[in-house]
Amino acid sequence: MNPEKVAETMDGETVQWMSQMSQDRMICGSLSIRENDLFFNRFLAFYQGKLVAQYDKRHLFSYGGEHEVYQAGNQTCVFTFQGFTLAPFVCYDLRFPAWIRKTVLRDELDCPDVLLFVANWPSARISAWDVLLKARAIENQAFVIGVNRIGNDEKGIAHNGHTQVVKYDGGYLLEPHQREAIAHVVIEKSPLSQFRDRFPFLSDADGF
């Protein structure tokens, strides 16, 4: 793991590309950012050329040595887009439900409608990816969008995608698949609101 080779500043080439590509859509993802001589695994979201959300990965993957070269974030992130409230997370964050619940409940009057996970999750542990995405959707009564890479990395570690969209009740709007693809998925807020009104168990959730 060598962020020195790939990290950019916030005015770097990839960040500028994301800004340019967002003129008529929202574009988001994570990349290695260098800031004040520190490295962050940072999620960025752009719309109409402007940065609308920024989140630094909270949980660093110590098994792979990420904690030795990256700085952990310490701030939750929630933002709005076209009437939806969204909360972004990066990869390994998926395994830590307390952090996600803390994000969801930071404003009890406006819990996130969509949880976004961008990931570099290997094939060897893909069953955990599938199960945890469903769990995060069900326990937080939210849509969950999980976007994962595909192909082999420089160490030969295989990644088989399984990008998916999970409903608040655990059903799929987009089932996991093992190919490169562009997916068009429509999510609607009214069924989510009705579901939360009918089963308001978030009001009984533990605070953190």
Predicted feature residues:
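Short beta->alpha transition motifs characteristic of CBS
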Residues: 1-3, 44, 55-61, 164, ...
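CN hydrolase (nitrilase-like) catalytic-core segments centered on the catalytic cysteine
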Residues: 10-28, 95, 100-182
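Short beta-strand scaffold segments in enzyme catalytic cores
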Residues: 29-31, 42-45, 77-79, 146, ...
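Active-site catalytic loop in hydrolytic enzyme cores
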Residues: 34-112, 124-131, 194-201
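Short, basic/aromatic-enriched C-terminal tail that caps enzymatic domains
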Residues: 184-208
